[in-house]
Amino acid sequence: MKLLVGILVAVCLHQYLLNADSNTKGWSEVLKGSECKPRPIVVPVSETHPELTSQRFNPPCVTLMRCGGCCNDESLECVPTEEVNVSMELLGASGSGSNGMQRLSFVEHKKCDCRPRFTTTPPTTTRPPRRRR
């Protein structure tokens, strides 16, 4: 029993010393933070609503959940598998001086997955057969 307690104390002390540097993130924390999942990103309103560029909005950017992160294979990419529309109220101002609250719709990513990358391949050209003389 004393041996078991001694081993347990040694393991705990070892873990404590490994984690003593608070600036170092452990492998599992790094892995979890890099996985393919929806994460908040700041997007300019003009990027999602280019048809409204004649207006200015306050705030000019919104925070949306978008897929991001890494896949464990270079041939895969992190893409949305489920999306949802969300409405947000923004203060809009046009060049004519009219101001008011506007409700705009944005797309958020609900679920993400690693899927094969679709690379564009150059078009193949076929030559007509050569005639023999």
UniProtKB/Swiss-Prot annotation:
Residues modified by glycosylation:
85
- Biological process terms in GO annotation: induction of positive chemotaxis; positive regulation of angiogenesis; positive regulation of cell division; positive regulation of endothelial cell proliferation; positive regulation of mast cell chemotaxis; response to hypoxia
Q: Name one GO molecular function term.
A: chemoattractant activity
Transmembrane residue ranges: none
Main subcellular location of this protein, as a coarse class:
secreted
Q: Which UniProt keywords apply?
A: Disulfide bond, Glycoprotein, Growth factor, Mitogen, Secreted, Signal
**GO cellular component terms listed in the entry, alphabetical order:** extracellular space; membrane
In which compartments does the protein localize? Secreted
Role according to the record: Induces endothelial proliferation.
Give the UniProt family note. Answer: Belongs to the PDGF/VEGF growth factor family.
Q: What is this protein called?
A: Vascular endothelial growth factor homolog
Give the organism the record lists.
Orf virus (strain NZ2)
